[in-house]
Amino acid sequence: AVLYNSPNFGSRTSLSNGKNAAFAVVLLLSLLIYGSRCLSQRNHLCACGNNHSSH
């Protein structure tokens, strides 16, 4: 049972680590896109800051 469970457990942990890494990459990309979009609109930078403070 131990020999059967250990490779299965290893594959599951690596799979969950891959999912976590992919989620982190997507989160960072969305933050970068949001930040660049906010900075590209210089006249709306104040409104963007107000949204952050209210949130």
From Swiss-Prot:
It holds the Pfam family Plant_vir_prot. It comes from the Viruses. It is a multi-pass membrane protein. GO terms for biological process: transport of virus in host, cell to cell. The chain crosses the membrane at residues 20-39. GO terms for cellular component: host cell membrane; membrane. The three proteins TGB1, TGB2 and TGB3 are required for virus movement. Belongs to the carlavirus/potexvirus TGB2 protein family. This is TGB2 protein. The lineage of its organism: Viruses, Riboviria, Orthornavirae, Kitrinoviricota, Alsuviricetes.
